[in-house]
Amino acid sequence: MNRSKTFGKIRKRLEEAKNKWARLCKVEYSYNESARLATDALLDGGVEDYEKVLNEEGEVDFLSGDEIQYIMKNIKEPMYSNDNQTEGECGSAANGNKSECFYPMNSDKSEPVSTLHNWSAEEKPYLKDKSSATVYFQTDKTNNVRETIRRCIHRTTQVLAILMDEFTDAEIFCDVLEAANKRNIFVYLLLDANKLHLFTQMCEKLQVRDLHMKNISVRSVTGDVYCAKSGKKFAGQIHEKFIISDWRCVLSGSYSFTWLSGQVHRNFLYKFSGVVVELFDEEFRHLYGSSKPVMGLKSPAPMAPVLRREDSGVSVMTDSTPESVNTTSEPFSSTSTASISNDSQRPKSPESTDPVLASPPRSPVRSPLQRMNSLHGYPSLISPPPQSNYQPNYYQRNYAPDSPSSFFNNNANIYRSFRMRQDDFSTPRFNQGWSLFSRSTMT
């Protein structure tokens, strides 16, 4: 009987588990060197070298056929040329990068640089709600998983953060577009890089372009990276799936944004609120900091402050489905005094009297997460900004000069993006005036 001189870690445990009379040993959770050597051989030489190392180490074949195929398909060559690699170096790049070897002390705790606002204990919105957890299963027809996700999107009033492995559901995509374009909700979408092409194909079939996604930031992210000593490496996939609504409610589970997941696949969904949302908040910050922007899809436009009433906010946990508090009245949708603004009240630019020729002042370039921080990080406004600082080509709320500014100071942390209406310059103006505290009169 031919037996290997040495037993690998997995093979040794397997033989002991199959032997009824073998003594029960303590389970080891330490690092498996034989598995690392075999994986490095697979990256460097292919399947034959992988099997050769397994025989030499006396280890079992621990990778399935699909896993081997995935690794071979996603191998990336090192950044440097093989001619520049000197003998004895362990992945040292010619461009001055550090070693490509895996050092747990340096890589396990490494955090990407993030520009997110760090909330204090008083500012964290998820601390305002009571901690709760609810589970939904696909078999529960009264609480459908797909409809629960769609209701969460419709009840969001400020920010929607989505981490998803696959996004091809056109109906859910319409919900996201409606939230961003109609209710001025800022959407931050992280997708798995390996399945990003499915999302872009859906956008092409639906004829969705950059101009339709001005309030949506789409970025791609990968899983952890395995790197061999030779410098070859491959990245994993994103199997985490969750939605953060207004940083107060989280939906997480096995559900993917696909038609099959909503119709035939078995899935479950968790709904969290309270302190546990902080863990999802930290994970999203970490992944967003290591993500890459998707080519062809722009980030949300710069935001300007819009004041709102204290009692106008709506919690995500309620059963009603109102519009976002960031949404202003559409000037062409109604002839009421609350939705029509006078041309004389529209802000004018001191440099030019022609609104078409006047160029809006440039705002500083800020990342999407910096703009998202402004939802929670800015102090209350003392008074409305002067009209001379407004951009003349955009619609936003006008402030009555005699309105008490202290009425808004307690809740002024909502920021929305400017909107340009090019068709307004060819449309006759309404002459009926509008005031913030005006009341309709009966005639």
Swiss-Prot record:
Q: Which UniProt keywords apply?
A: Cytoplasm
Ranges of biased composition (kind: Low complexity): 327-344, 388-399
Q: Which GO terms describe its biological process?
A: cell population proliferation; epidermal growth factor receptor signaling pathway
Polar residues bias: where? 315-326
Entries under SUPFAM superfamilies matching the protein: Phospholipase D/nuclease
Function (record text): May function in the epidermal growth factor receptor/EGFR signaling pathway.
Protein name according to UniProt: Protein FAM83A
**Native species of this protein?**
Xenopus laevis
